[in-house]
A protein has these predicted regions:
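RNase H-like, Mg2+-dependent phosphodiesterase core
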Residues: 1-205
């Protein structure tokens, strides 16, 4: 709801992938922010490359007028693959598509290479390299969120729709112009908040 969309492509030599397991990488959603930050440095030491793609909320709003979120993520992954110095042989991808394999087809529209694409649901849970990429993306996004909090002088939580603090912040601050550039306006939850009847707002809003 608030902040950028961040994805990460991580590459690792096959004989070093087990090192990621040893340091404790797992689905980033299962780790605390402190643990993710602790693992960040270790992951950068083990991985060959980390390509991080950030799409601001403002850019996302423009793109979502023309494309679905899945399409935008496919574009970003296609760009990330094109930016790797040493193209990977196999790429495991946590698919956001309801039909997991369909996401691979989307990516191929934006990057044509010799690597094998494997799109699966819960790939960031099943493959250490996906877990590592997920952790890097989360830490990078959290850093941006912290900067936004400082600018707006408010702790609005994680910026996700599952966070009550984020929902409350938007309800109370939707009218503030300086907040608008950070809002993902095309998100369904944001649309619901925008469509509230005037009578639902407090007098001081």
């Amino acid at each position: 709801m608030l902040g950028p969309l961040v994805i990460c492509l991580a590459t690792v030599e096959k004989d070093r992938e087990q090192e990621l397991k040893k340091i404790g990488v797992k689905d980033s959603k299962l780790l605390t922010p402190k643990k993710r930050e602790h693992l960040y440095g270790k992951i950068t030491e083990i991985c060959n490359e980390l390509v991080v793609m950030k799409t601001t909320a403002a850019s996302l709003n423009e793109e979502m007028k023309k494309h679905s979120l899945n399409e935008i993520e496919a574009m970003d992954l296609g760009k990330a693959l094109s930016l790797t110095k040493k193209p990977p042989e196999i790429v495991y991808i946590d698919s956001p598509d309801t039909v997991a394999g369909r996401f691979c087809i989307r990516i191929r529209k934006y990057h044509v290479g010799n690597e094998q694409l494997i799109c699966e649901h819960k790939a960031d849970f099943n493959y250490p390299i996906c877990s590592a990429a997920s952790i890097i993306a989360k830490v990078e996004r959290d850093a941006v969120i912290e900067e936004i909090k400082k600018e707006l002088c408010c702790n609005f939580g994680s910026g996700y729709s599952s966070d009550d603090r984020t929902i409350k912040f938007l309800k109370d601050n939707m009218h503030r112009l300086e907040v608008h550039k950070y809002i993902r306006k095309e998100w369904a939850t944001v649309e619901k908040l925008k469509q509230r009847k005037l009578s639902e707002f407090d007098a001081d809003e």
